[in-house]
Amino acid sequence: MKSTLMTASLLILVVLFIIDYASVYAEFIDGEISLERERDIPCFETCMKLYHIPKLCYIKCRKH
């Protein structure tokens, strides 16, 4: 009985660790996407002033 209880407790701890890691990683990815968008906005605006072609500017600025 103690062995089953210990195994269940360990399994719960592992699941909680995985969930915590996933949430931290998701926040990191969300932050990276926000930073990428902030960098793309000035690029896109400058490109539009020069070329006036939204599709070209979108492709050009996404490569940075």
UniProtKB/Swiss-Prot annotation:
Propiece span(s): 27-38
Would the keyword Disulfide bond be found if you checked this record's keyword annotation?
Answer: yes
Molecular functions per Gene Ontology: potassium channel regulator activity; toxin activity
Q: What is its main location?
A: secreted
Entry comment describing in which tissues the protein is expressed: Expressed by the venom gland.
- Specify the signal sequence span: 1-26
Annotated Gene Ontology cellular components are: extracellular region
Know anything about its domains from the record?
Has the structural arrangement of two alpha-helices stabilized by disulfide bonds (CSalpha/alpha 2(S-S)).
* Family that this chain belongs to: Belongs to the short scorpion toxin superfamily. Potassium channel inhibitor kappa-KTx family. Kappa-KTx 4 subfamily.
Q: What is this protein called?
A: Potassium channel toxin kappa-KTx 4.1
Q: Which organism is it from?
A: Heterometrus petersii
